[in-house]
A protein has these predicted regions:
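Beta-lactam-recognizing serine transpeptidase/beta-lactamase-like catalytic domain environment
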Residues: 85-86, 128-171, 176-411
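Short beta-strands and strand-coil junctions in structured, solvent-facing domains, enriched
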Residues: 108, 413-414
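Carboxylate/His-rich catalytic cores and anion/metal-binding grooves
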Residues: 55-75, 117-137, 241
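Envelope-exposed proteins and targeting segments
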Residues: 36-39, 94-98, 120-123, 193, ...
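Short, gly/Ser/Thr-rich active-site loops of penicillin-recognizing serine hydrolases
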Residues: 325-330, 421-434
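Short, charged, low-complexity patches
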Residues: 296, 415-424
Length: 434
């Protein structure tokens, strides 16, 4: 208004003052049609109250009951006087504020990388390894916060925040199984891969039934050998794997704010794993096991940070309407792994990117560590083709890790093809901006 530009206001009769020459319009926030972090922020109803996300969690802090008043000169009959100056005034906007841990530059880089990587259904999340702060989280598809009704009939679940939702994860869970083995002194375990193996009468194949030959833990991670991890799982036993998974945070929800809670996922029970075939499936992240992208990122933080992680958090501080600020910090790290296991796994996952099937994730100017995954879902399209969740999760730089990044795509081809290049683009963008 101060720029002299025309503004169209949609008002109802209840919003017109009883004083005939004053028009009162409530002050509402309005988001751009391409708002970053839309699933985190949420959207408002027609009265300006938050319905989802941060807007709902902190509605009592963010809602404004202020109004803009337009005084319009009128004659004795209530008709506006042509050419008269309109006087615009507004009430003091009495609202608080919520400061998130999101870094806008990183968030924008993630949003762009997802779209550039053609991830139409999926997500990406970036976590600061030092303290667990969520620096970026983007989900696809998005919805328009100003025209929510346009997306209500969509079959692709545009309102679902995939960063906090659980999915079949596949081979990226091999990182947790490898951690369980290292914690128990099995880093020297080897086996012969012939492209497939039979356990409990069920045949499990490696990708394209490739025979990897004699494989140790480092090589098994590089080529993502199912046969190796199936045999390793049988040697470890179900309890060892589930105990390590629990230490890394799998099967546990995380509350970021009131109503913003990540799904706990599903860790199979001891009863569900009491057959060799069920344990074999679990050993490479298949079967009933599910986890959220934020849980995968949390696991990678532990690997990168000497075996410790801080639970991911999203809200840095809240200032209420009286001006009182409350800050939130992560001061209590969880010790999940030994420093020695962390060091060895970091070296192995760096080799996955340098020499293995994660090479398409390699950043331009520094090293990274990570793991691919292509997870079967048991869901088929109309042509009978199984839809897979594809993943890449990693951290960088390998020698002094700062960020953990996880990308997931629904209906993808492979983690190496779909998600690893997106990781590389995000890592390069963050390095350039800093």
């Amino acid at each position: 208004m101060s720029d002299g530009l025309p503004v169209m206001l949609n008002i109802g009769k209840r919003e017109i003052s009883s004083d005939s020459d004053i028009l009162c319009v409530p002050i509402y926030r309005r988001y751009s049609d391409s708002q970053p972090a839309q699933h985190l922020l949420g959207y408002l109803d027609e009265t300006g109250h938050g319905l989802t996300g941060i807007e709902k969690a902190f509605d009592s802090v963010l809602f404004s009951d202020g109004e803009v008043k337009a005084r319009v000169p009128a004659d004795a009959y209530g008709r506006t006087i042509s050419g008269s100056e309109i006087e615009i005034t507004s009430d003091p906007v009495n609202i608080g504020s919520v400061r998130l841990t999101i870094d806008l530059d990183i968030q924008n880089a993630v949003e762009y990388a997802l779209d550039n990587g053609k991830i139409s259904e999926g997500c990406a999340i970036v976590i600061d390894i030092e303290d667990g702060a969520v620096r970026a989280a983007a989900s696809r598809p998005v919805y328009n916060a100003n025209r929510v009704s346009d997306s209500l009939s969509s079959s692709s679940a545009p309102f679902l925040n995939r960063c906090f939702s659980s999915f079949a994860v596949g081979s990226i869970f091999k990182v947790a199984v490898a951690a369980a083995a290292l914690e128990r002194g099995l880093d020297g375990f080897e086996c012969e891969c012939k492209g497939s193996c039979s356990v409990g009468g069920v045949v499990f194949g490696c990708s394209s039934n490739t025979a990897h030959g004699k494989v140790d833990l480092k090589k098994a991670l590089e080529v993502s050998c199912n046969t190796y991890f199936i045999n390793l799982g049988q040697k470890l036993g179900a309890d060892a794997i589930t105990e390590t998974a629990a230490l890394l945070g799998f099967g546990q929800k995380n509350e970021f704010a009131d109503g913003i809670i990540s799904e706990p996922g599903t860790v199979p029970t001891a009863e569900a794993l009491n057959t060799p075939a069920a344990l074999a499936n679990f050993s490479f992240g298949q079967g009933s096991f599910t986890a959220s992208p934020v849980q995968i990122a949390q696991m990678l933080c532990a690997v990168a940070n000497s075996g410790k992680y801080n639970r991911p958090y999203l809200v840095a501080s809240v200032t209420d309407k009286s001006g009182k600020e409350t800050s939130y910090e992560n001061k209590y790290p969880v010790v999940a792994l030994s420093e020695e296991t962390s060091r060895k796994l970091t070296e192995m996952l760096t080799s996955v990117v340098e020499n293995g099937n994660g090479s398409s994730a390699k950043p331009k100017d520094f090293s990274a560590a990570g793991k691919t995954a292509t997870a079967q879902t048991g869901i088929f399209d109309k042509n009978g083709v199984e839809l897979c969740n594809t993943w890449f999760g990693g951290f960088f730089p390998s020698d002094n890790p700062k960020y953990a990044v996880v990308i997931m795509k629904q209906g993808g081809s492979s983690g190496a093809e779909d998600c690893a290049p997106v990781f590389r683009q995000i890592a390069d963008s963050i390095n350039f901006s800093e």
